[in-house]
Amino acid sequence: MQKYLEKANVLIEALPYIRKFNSKIILIKYGGSAMENEELKHCVMQDIALLKLVGLKPIIVHGGGKDISAMCEKLGVKSEFKNGLRVSDKATTEVASMVLNHINKNLVHSLQNLGVKAIGLCGKDGALLECVKKDENLAFVGTIQKVNSKILEELLEKDFLPIIAPIGMDENFNTYNINADDAACAIAKALRAEKLAFLTDTAGLYEDFNDKNSLISKISLEQAKILAPKIEGGMHVKLKSCIDACENGVKKVHILDGRVKHSLLLEFFTDEGIGTLVG
């Protein structure tokens, strides 16, 4: 009997959050181990399907860095990185487009199997993500200048769940590879999303990354600005994205451990949450 009561309590705990976030846009940046491990992948798809089916409006932006690197190696296309960003010449950009399209359609298939009306897009579709070149040294890596959010708003209105591959184009129809974190942040800002969640390979934001007891469960925007200069590496970039999002219309940003099963549900629908909440 006790285990049934515990299950009931879980549902009761989730109820106020389901009510609070009903019809709200939730932007999920999907990447890291949660994309590479089949069991974790299935858990993430279940979480997102449940978010959709209880009335939230999720949108997925996915990465694919390791798969792109593997395909480049297989095809003999040289991979080069500068400051953590892939240098994308025309050959690399073509490989990235191919790999991301394949990942995108697999995600659509997974969510369709869970009863969700999912639709796959890349940033070139309908000029969803309009770009300019980020840096001459990075070749076809783009910075988003405009998100044509009307496309996404209409899809959400028709009960679709958009899944977006981070490929964009410029005014001359050149194709650009876009950092998936940047794409997720730009789309969340354009839609003034209720939440932006980054699935990562870390438990969240640490005050001192070498001290695993320094995990920050919640941090205000002002505190995040003070902490940002003290953080190094990839998490510094991610925290800057969190600050940018919160300053431009996104209510809350979450840094979650994608290696934990059902981390999205644990963060959104429980009192304690998991990971770091910014904002």
UniProtKB/Swiss-Prot annotation:
Localization annotation: Cytoplasm
Gene Ontology biological process terms in this record: arginine biosynthetic process via ornithine; L-arginine biosynthetic process
GO molecular function, one term: ATP binding
Xref: InterPro entries: AceGlu_kinase-like_sf (IPR036393), AcgluKinase_fam (IPR004662), ArgB (IPR037528), Asp/Glu/Uridylate_kinase (IPR001048), Glu/AcGlu_kinase (IPR001057), NAGK-C (IPR041727)
SUPFAM superfamilies named among the record's database cross-references: Carbamate kinase-like
Family matches, as Gene3D superfamilies: Acetylglutamate kinase-like
NCBIfam families hit by this protein: argB
PANTHER family, sorted: N-ACETYLGLUTAMATE SYNTHASE (PTHR23342), N-ACETYLGLUTAMATE SYNTHASE, MITOCHONDRIAL (PTHR23342:SF0)
Protein name per the record: Acetylglutamate kinase
Gene: argB
